[in-house]
Each structure stands twice: as C-alpha cells, then as structure tokens.
C-alpha cells in the first residue's frame, strides 16, 4: 500500500470512503468494549466467588493464635496470612507485613514515608535539593505517576530481553548520591512480558549505592502468574541475594492477590529486611491500628496454603492460555 503522501486526491477520497463504510459496519454491531488493561474477565472473577461463602455470621472469626479478627490488633497482618503471602513471595514470614487491598498503596506510602521521614534515619528526601529515580522503560505507568507526583526526577533505563541495562543502572547508582531508588517489575514485566535474568538479579543485589538510602522497589506482581505450570520463568530471590551481597536493607519487595482473587479486594504485602520492617513499624503503627483482618482470614480459609494459591492460578491459566495460543 502506498503511503498517504504518495496517493493522489482521487485515491485518498476512495480510501476515505472505504474506511468510512468499514467503520459503519463495526459501529452497527453495537459493541461496548472495555479496553482497560489489567482487568480480569468475568470468568476469571467467577473463580473466586466461593471465597465470599467461607465466612458468614456464624463463622469462628479467630486466628490460629486466638486473636479476634473483628477487633483491633495485628498491625502487620494475621499470622496465617503473613505466612501465605510469604510463601507466595518466597520469603520468610518475619520479613512480611500484610496490609490492605493494594500493593500500589504500599508503594505510594513507602515513597511518601521516605519523603517525609527519610529511610532508616537518613535525611528526609523532601529536604534534599534533588531526588532521582531510575525507571526501566517500557514500565508501569502507575509507578511513574507516584514519583512524578512527589516531584522526583525520573531517569529512563532501557530494557532488553534480560531486564534493565545494568551497566547504566550501576553507573547511576554507584556514582550519584541523588539516585534514591529504582522501579522494577522482575517477572513477566508489562508490556513485553520479559523476566529478569539471573545475572541481572544478582547485579542488582551487588550494587554499591553512593546513597545510603537507595532502595530497590521490587514489584513482584506476577510471581505466580504462569500460563504454563510445567514451563515457567524463575528468578533468584532478591532478598536472599541482597543479604548474601551484604546489602540486606536495599530492597522492598511488593506483592498482592489482585490478579489472583479480586482486584481491589485482595490482600497485599511488603517484604523486606528486619531492620526495614522495624522502621516501617514505627510509622505504620501511628498511621493505622490494623488493616482488614476479616479479608485476610477470608483469603486464608479459601486458599488454605501456597498449594491452594497455585491451584487457583492454574484455573486462571486455563482461561487465558487459549488467548496466547490463538
């Protein structure tokens, strides 16, 4: 087909008429399509409907430790839900804080806390002349909206099939003390679906930040979201790798059940070092007495354990797989 610049007036008018007829044909179908990305379909949402029946007015509402989920307490989440999400994120329970329905909310709070109170005793970012974040591109627009909102300068980092350009990441992180963080989606990263290579993960863990308050924001949103159960991507555990490299406090890992149970009505968590957990506790216990523990209990009783989560994800995969194989 010729480019529009090469077409004559008659050819352009003919093409315009043809396209208008095609448009009218599609318009006549009366379709109402929601093109928003990241929203599970109705058949996927139906998979979790039995969860709404596992707790009712006659249910025992106590945790395994005997705490009443209807009341205040358990600022870091009920123990069994912390264990469930720890297993999902492949970390230790003591490193996990279970929050509300949104991991994005935790990320926002984590940046806001760093702006207002600093990071583990460092100077609050709001008092610094310049704060920069590295942003692998293409990436998640909602990550970038958070840093944009707080006036943080964003630096694009190119991506390839192995993940971010680590030569560039190391150059910025190891030499510029105004670089305070980097956004990462290490597994099945949108929109390309790439997973970070083992080498990339280990190079992240072995960074030597010029800034003592530099943090990796590791959004492991798709950690169990495999299309094929027998063949799927695996990555080294970033918390373990950072600890081995002598950088135990350098990473915040985020996760949720938003694409597992109900988007907007799931449970979310942050996993990080014990030192970071303690710093977060000092602020979070002022901010909130406890999140929705009834929803946490509901998720635990529905999924029961990590095997229940994985079996549920296989049902999602069965719905989605034909779309990838079409």
Regions from the language model: what does each represent?
Residues 67-212, 223-246:
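Conserved core of the PLP fold type I
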Residues 99, 240-321:
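Conserved core segment of the aminotransferase class I/II
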Residues 181, 215-216, 252:
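Hydrophobic "anchor" residues on beta-strands that sit immediately upstream
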Residues 44-49, 227-231, 264-267:
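Short aromatic-enriched loop/helix-cap "lid" or pocket-rim segments at secondary-structure transitions
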Residues 15, 81, 316-326:
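Alpha-helical packing segments of well-folded alpha/beta enzyme cores
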Residues 220:
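Walker B catalytic acidic pair
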Residues 2-76, 86-87:
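N-terminal "arm"/small-domain region of PLP-dependent enzymes with the aminotransferase-like
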